[in-house]
């Protein structure tokens, strides 16, 4: 009798279901090819050291953060990016941090609309035009100042 119960228990255990893995998130669709994204990245890195200028949108005249993004995307991908950080929040597709690739946008804020933006260049780094008196530079997303910000990511 015990052997029948044991055999039945073994049979039922063998019929158990395997845990189902959650589906992978759908890839984010982009207007920018991977090759264009690489050109965006290379061009952004090449602008490091360009002076900051409020309202600036050329390498000769300097850049503010949205001007840098607009110039790079127009030059390398033929896209017209919005010229304000608030408008960049609606440009392209949102994406989770684990899908971030070079050429994507990073937007920073403090709980309200974003107030600053840059171009992700890989390995946890981004290029941006930070402030008056400064220059276009590369920073790390995990640097103290940026890690405290609310961050979102967009793929044009």
Name each region found by the language model.
Residues 1-4:
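Bacterial N-terminal signal peptides that target proteins for export
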Residues 31-38, 59-64, 94, 144:
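Soluble non-cytosolic domains of exported or imported proteins
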Residues 38-41, 45, 49, 66-70, ...:
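Extracytoplasmic/secreted envelope proteins and their assembly/folding machinery
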Residues 145-156:
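Glycine- and charge-enriched low-complexity intrinsically disordered segments
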Residues 28-29, 79-140:
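...with weaker cross-activation on analogous glycine-rich loops/strands in unrelated enzymes
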Residues 53-81:
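Secreted/periplasmic proteins that engage bacterial cell-wall peptidoglycan
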Residues 9-34:
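Bacterial Sec signal peptide processing site at the extreme N-terminus
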């Amino acid at each position: 009798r015990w052997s029948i119960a044991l055999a039945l228990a073994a049979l039922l255990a063998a019929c158990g279901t395997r845990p189902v893995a959650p589906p992978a998130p759908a890839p984010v669709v982009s207007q920018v090819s991977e090759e264009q994204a690489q050109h965006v990245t290379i061009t952004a890195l090449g602008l490091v050291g360009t002076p900051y200028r409020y309202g600036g949108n050329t390498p000769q005249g300097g850049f503010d953060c949205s001007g840098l993004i607009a110039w790079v995307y127009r030059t390398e991908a033929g896209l017209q990016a919005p010229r304000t950080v608030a408008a960049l929040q609606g440009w392209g597709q949102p994406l989770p941090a684990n899908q971030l690739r070079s050429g994507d946008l990073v937007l920073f804020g403090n709980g309200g609309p974003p107030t600053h933006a840059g171009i992700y260049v890989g390995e946890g780094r981004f290029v941006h035009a930070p402030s008056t008196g400064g220059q276009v530079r590369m920073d790390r997303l995990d640097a103290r100042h940026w890690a405290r910000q609310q961050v979102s990511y967009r793929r044009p």
